[in-house]
Each structure stands twice: as C-alpha cells, then as structure tokens.
Amino acid sequence: MKKIKYPDYMNSTVSLANSVLKYFGAPVHHETLALLDRELAEREYENVVLLLLDGMGKCIIDGNLEPDGFFASHLAGTYSAVFPPTTVAATTSICSGLYPVEHCWLGWDCYYPKIDKTVTVFLNREAGTTKPAADYPVAKTLCPYQSLVEQIRENSG
C-alpha cells in the first residue's frame, strides 16, 4: 500500500506567499519559506515575480524533463501544496498567503447557499454553463480576501 504524503505546512505554497509579504514589510499570516527568505535577503529587489505553473510538481520534473534542462537544473528546493491541492485552492493560497480553510476557495466548482447556485469560481459562471452566476463576482464577494499586492500596498505607508 502506498504511503500517504501529508502537506508540510511549515514548508508550503502558503509559506512562499508569506515570505513575499515579509520581504515587503507586510504582516505575515503563517510561517515563511526559509529557502525564499534566504534568497530575498541576498539582494534588495524592487519587484518579486511569482510564476505559478499549475501541476508542475517534483515528480513531473523528474519524470518528464531533462536533468540538465532549465527547470531541473535551477531547482533550489521543494515545498508542499495546500490541501485540497486543487487549482483554485492552491492559486488562491499563493495569491493571499492564506490556507484554503481561511479563504474558502476550495475547488473549481463551489456551491454557494446564499445564491443557491454552484459556481465555476474563477469564471464566475453557473457550473456547466456559460451563464454568469451573478452580476457581481460571487466568490470574491461571498469569500473575500486581500491579495498579496493589496496587502503590500496597504502596509507600504
């Protein structure tokens, strides 16, 4: 039987986002990612760009890319995804510095009792249709969060 791999919440995508907050002087919500903290401390960066490659885990790199290729040869370390490891939950965690249980953006399609609809979250459509779920962004309205950029701007004086 395969061993269950649990998320390492001390070394995760949420930690990465919190390192960015820390670097720009914004309050952090959780542990930071030591590897990124060290990298950011080496120089004074005016901008930090995060490139999120959905589904690009270590096993994908090892199994599909050349060892001397760009990604494999520049790999500095690994960290855990959040749980649930869905595109929506992971992306929102990177964008907010919060765990899915805190931001509540859990999956591609989520049911919102307040409007009695299942919404394709990132598209703001009724699930399985092209029809807008509402005339406002449902998930952002009912489960609001501040993006990293908003948090940094708010705390930059």
Roles of regions detected by a PLM:
Residues 1-35:
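N- or domain-start disorder-to-order transition segments that initiate the globular core
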Residues 5, 45, 50, 80-83:
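Generic structural signal for short, flexible, solvent-exposed coil/loop and linker residues
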Residues 33-45:
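A short acidic-Thr-Gly-centered motif at the start of a beta-strand
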Residues 34, 54, 76-77:
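Short secondary-structure boundary micro-motifs
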Residues 46-58, 94:
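Beta-strand elements within well-structured catalytic alpha/beta cores of enzymes
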